[in-house]
Amino acid sequence: MTTLTARPEAITFDPQQSALIVVDMQNAYATPGGYLDLAGFDVSTTRPVIANIQTAVTAARAAGMLIIWFQNGWDEQYVEAGGPGSPNFHKSNALKTMRKQPQLQGKLLAKGSWDYQLVDELVPQPGDIVLPKPRYSGFFNTPLDSILRSRGIRHLVFTGIATNVCVESTLRDGFFLEYFGVVLEDATHQAGPEFAQKAALFNIETFFGWVSDVETFCDALSPTSFAHIA
């Protein structure tokens, strides 16, 4: 068992019965020219987040944790995105951006596109699981719950973008399904102003889970390994 220093209190878990969740580290969310950038969100400070996720993934894999990568998006015709009868049609900033800029139609969050791809620095390895998801929550219309329960996994460590949207949505849904969720705050990035990051982390540590950081996580898994990994 491993005890991780976190807010509001430490949490103990078995790494081999836990998963590291990497949420939507796609060009869409972390790279200039991707969806978030084109929709007017600031992605200029995502590079340190990518590096921190690399470090967390390396440590988690060495400790025997399952690594799950999410990719948010839809088919090329956007059927999976939902039509006017879906709130997603009206609230998705990707869909709204494409309606405002028709030349982008088929380029944002479409499976097979550059936008949909994971950033070059983050490459899933054999044994990892890569899951597409059609909405903010990684539990909605995906096999995530079944995958975790079949492996006896109850503790989830979250990284990725955006803290206040898909990361928080997935962690909240996990809370309702009796999963223990931890966010590594320096391995996440918000969509919107800095206060959105702070508010999401406040919500998580106060109501839904725990908040820690990459160095503390790596030290908890192997106290002597962090310097080597970094």
Curated annotation (Swiss-Prot):
Its EC number is 3.5.1.110. It holds the Pfam family Isochorismatase. It catalyses: (Z)-3-ureidoacrylate + H2O + H(+) = (Z)-3-aminoacrylate + NH4(+) + CO2; (Z)-3-ureidoacrylate + H2O = (Z)-3-aminoacrylate + carbamate + H(+); (Z)-2-methylureidoacrylate + H2O + H(+) = (Z)-2-methylaminoacrylate + NH4(+) + CO2. GO terms for molecular function: hydrolase activity, acting on carbon-nitrogen (but not peptide) bonds, in linear amides. Induction: Up-regulated by the nitrogen regulatory protein C (NtrC also called GlnG) and repressed by RutR. It is an enzyme of class 3 (hydrolase). GO terms for biological process: nitrogen utilization; uracil catabolic process. The keyword Transport does not apply. The keyword Protein biosynthesis does not apply. The active site is at 24 (proton acceptor), 133, 166 (nucleophile). Keywords: Hydrolase. InterPro entries: Isochorismatase-like_dom, Isochorismatase-like_hydrls, Isochorismatase-like_sf, RutB. Belongs to the isochorismatase family. RutB subfamily. Hydrolyzes ureidoacrylate to form aminoacrylate and carbamate. The carbamate hydrolyzes spontaneously, thereby releasing one of the nitrogen atoms of the pyrimidine ring as ammonia and one of its carbon atoms as CO2. This is Ureidoacrylate amidohydrolase RutB. The lineage of its organism: Bacteria, Pseudomonadati, Pseudomonadota, Gammaproteobacteria, Enterobacterales.
